[in-house]
Amino acid sequence: MKSIKITLLFLFSIALGLFTSCEQFLEVTPKESISDALTIVDKTSAETAIRGVYSALADGGYYGTTYQSIGYLSGDNIVWTGSQSQVQEFINKKVNADNSTISTAWIAIYRTINRANNVIAKVPTVSDPQLTEALKNQIIGEAYFIRALAYFDLARVWGGVPIVTQPTLVPTENIGIPRKSVEETYAQVLADLETAEPLLPSTTNRYRATKKTVWALKSRFYLYQKNWSKSEEFASKLIADSTNYRLIKPFSSFFANNARGTQESVFEIFYNGTTEVNAHRGQWQTQTNGGTRQWAPNDSLVLLLNTPATGGGRSALIAKDNQNRWYGNLYYRQPGSDPSYVFRIAELYLIRAEARAQLGKINEGLADLNAVRSRAALAPGTAANKDALLLAIEKERRLEFALEPHRWFDIVRTGRAAAVFKVTDPNRFVLPIPVQQLLSDKALTQNPGY
């Protein structure tokens, strides 16, 4: 793994302790190769360090574009209109180890982990009267949550990965750490979430980690682990909080007209469009809108979204340009101030629907599915049995998150990659470890089949 020295500006509009609106980050320079003693020594530097963790999460290599593109391009909703053969590898479900996208994502995620590790290691030792116990716990809890999310994202792309829990001070420090199993990697995710939860406040914040953000990731985590009861339990915690979270209508309300931080959002990443830029719009928008349209909805997705019985209000996700070409319109703000959506309440409804279906609670699961359909201005769906309900949920997730990076991961985790994607080689369900990492660290082993 490479240790990268980075300076990102990430502005917050109000102080770290407030939890009611988007908070813009102050200047952040959390160096990963300087003396540890100079990094976090008081309240100000502790706040700076946690901002640096969020800035790494928002980076273009992670939720800013690259990591999410793995989910988009590997599914069956998007076509690549550009000329780079490496991007087409995702569409073809045949990604090579020298693919620059996976290398960029790997480095960005481990950079995020390293910054979180720095906070986790140093903030508990800070003695500053201005750094209250509550604020100290919050900062540490946020770092644990983000590290949990990072390892979760690593596990679902690469399987088992090296588990690094101490901050990197020089680029060679993490050389020689072997990969853990996928089970051990997911165990690290849960351990970090269990640590984060009691440290975090119970307030609602759509841009910072709280207990509620932990519940959202726990619900998704347990879905991947097939622990249906736990997945249902944590989804229900958020759905029950209807004062703060609800399926807002019409469907486009959570993103259209420059909306951000709506009641639809459980956790989204803020970009101001100047010092923090979300590069998604450049890939989705057309040339006349200042983009490249290199990611575009394919014909099957366009048909599904534009058919009233299946797409409903979700047809707002796509639009036509002056050349009669369809393009994705979830990310449209210029210059690049769209949020990145990490958790929406719609996902929690569909997670609970799936968990309930697996538990044999067909009517309750169908009610959750139909809540999402109703918000999309669709007629209620029907399902006579568990299998029918699971298939209906799968189809709904494809359209509800048509331009969000869920589809590939959904189909792989449910064991339907052969049926849906015609991918029969299970080695292809995870991606190769980037060749640059293998060359620099002989302790790393490649995934089978690559």
Language-model segments: what does each one mean?
Residues D36-A37, G64-S85, V161-T165, P201-R281, ...:
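Short, surface-exposed recognition loops and adjoining beta-strand edges that mediate ligand/DNA contacts
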